[in-house]
């Protein structure tokens, strides 16, 4: 991908996306994507207190996402947000390719586009949905019945 192609794609994609994702078990998880200051996309899911993963730091979560989890924080509504970024080894970092400066790193690799990051967010949401307290209760009751 050359500079012009990347510029066009970034302009077409925009800098953010938000949606509600309904997981295969019926749990609804809010997802979002934001472009960071280095122009790489970052994906996030929002967990409510109904999820047993609520408040647990990303280093302590056994969840898989592109490059591993790299973010956690409470949002303005006191929900727990966890996320990942697409600025890892083997990722094309848009800033380094589009910059006027000459960099020897970050210019090769694969650009992780909005569709890729959306898919990763939804995979992360599916994993986290298993820890919804309502799903955990349902599974326990199903084993008893």
Task: List where the protein language model places each region.
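Short acidic, low-complexity intrinsically disordered linear motifs used
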Residues: 133-145
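Generic structural signal for residues positioned in beta-strands
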Residues: 32, 44, 81-85
């Amino acid at each position: 991908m050359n500079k012009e192609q990347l510029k066009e794609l970034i302009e077409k994609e925009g800098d953010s996306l938000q949606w509600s994702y309904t997981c295969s078990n019926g749990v609804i998880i809010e997802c979002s994507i934001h472009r960071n200051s280095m122009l790489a996309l970052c994906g996030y899911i929002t967990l409510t207190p109904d999820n047993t993963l609520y408040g647990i730091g990303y280093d302590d979560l056994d969840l898989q996402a592109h490059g591993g989890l790299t973010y956690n924080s409470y949002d303005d509504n006191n929900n727990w947000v966890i996320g990942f970024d697409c600025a890892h080894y083997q990722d094309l970092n848009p800033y380094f390719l589009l910059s006027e400066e000459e960099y020897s790193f970050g210019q090769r690799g694969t650009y992780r586009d909005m569709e890729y990051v959306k898919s990763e967010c939804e995979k992360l949401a599916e994993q986290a949905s298993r820890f919804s307290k309502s799903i955990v209760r349902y599974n326990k009751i199903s084993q008893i019945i």
